[in-house]
A protein has these predicted regions:
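Hydrophobic, helix-length membrane anchors
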Residues: 1-33, 37, 120-132
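Alpha-helix initiation and N-capping motif
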Residues: 14-17, 63, 80, 109
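Generic structural signal for well-ordered, non-membrane alpha-helices
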Residues: 15, 19-22, 44, 48, ...
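Alpha-helix C-capping/helix-to-loop hinge sites
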Residues: 24-27, 52-53, 73, 96
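Non-catalytic alpha-helical coupling and interface elements of nucleotide-dependent molecular machines
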Residues: 26, 47, 51, 117-121
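Short linear functional motifs in flexible/disordered or boundary regions
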Residues: 29, 54, 62, 102-105, ...
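Short, charged amphipathic alpha-helical segments flanked by flexible coils
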Residues: 34-85, 89
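Cytosol-/stroma-facing membrane-proximal "stalk/adaptor" domains immediately downstream
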Residues: 72-132
Length: 132
């Protein structure tokens, strides 16, 4: 009798998302004039995380629609305003051709990381994440 090996453990959504945010930060697409692409990627990464972690239809919802959906979950209230600001700035860069300043790009990445860690229960141990 052949016994099938157990499936590999699932990688938690916050780990995947933090890796994606780190890769996006390393690429710094805004430095190559790709601000729209940066904000499209940032928004997609966060929305995918919200779908996986909180089972809300974030990919097909507007920013305005996402926020009330998250209130019905265990998403931390204190992170709502930060998330909304990052998604709003992403929307403005993508749709209104109104990109934030270069300093805002790094801040939005920082805030995205902060939202993910606060909403996942993740306890930072890596020095990159300890000062959030």
């Amino acid at each position: 009798m052949v016994v099938a090996a157990p499936p590999p453990p699932q990688v938690p959504p916050h780990e995947i998302t933090l890796q994606q945010l780190a890769a996006l930060e390393q690429q710094k697409p805004w430095k190559n004039g790709k601000t729209d692409a940066f904000y499209a990627d940032l928004s997609m990464i966060l929305r995918t995380y919200l779908e996986r972690r909180f089972q809300v239809p974030a990919l097909e919802s507007t920013t305005r629609e996402i926020m009330p959906l998250l209130k019905k979950t265990d998403f931390p209230d204190q992170q709502s305003k930060i998330l909304q600001e990052v998604l709003y700035q992403s929307d403005m860069a993508k749709f209104a051709q109104s990109p934030p300043s270069e300093q805002a790009h790094e801040k939005n990445l920082h805030n995205a990381r902060k939202v993910v860690m606060a909403s996942s229960g993740f306890v930072p141990t890596h020095p990159t994440y300890t000062n959030l």
